Amino acid sequence: MQIKHLITLFFLVLIGADQCSAFFSLIPSLIGGLVFAIKGRKKREVSPQIDQYRNFQKREAELEELLDRLPMY
């Protein structure tokens, strides 16, 4: 074989090995994602959502009060 064929073959093997290592490093995250999908997501706690809703209502009331104080042009 000529040198240019050996260099081409070397680069092809190098690229193939790089792609395989990238694929193999992806496998653990893929398995983790499948386990996460099968087990289902953790149920969210309701209390933070209730606090968020109360804060939203409070800000909405403050905004309405502020708008009521503005003069009408």
UniProtKB/Swiss-Prot annotation:
Expression across tissues: Expressed by the venom gland.
GO BP term (any one): defense response to bacterium
Propeptide: 45-73
Keyword Cytoplasm included in the entry's annotation: no
GO cellular component entries: extracellular region
Chief location of this protein within or outside the cell: secreted
Leader sequence residues: 1-22
Function statement: Antibacterial peptide.
Protein name: Putative antimicrobial peptide clone 5
Organismal lineage: Eukaryota, Metazoa, Ecdysozoa, Arthropoda, Chelicerata
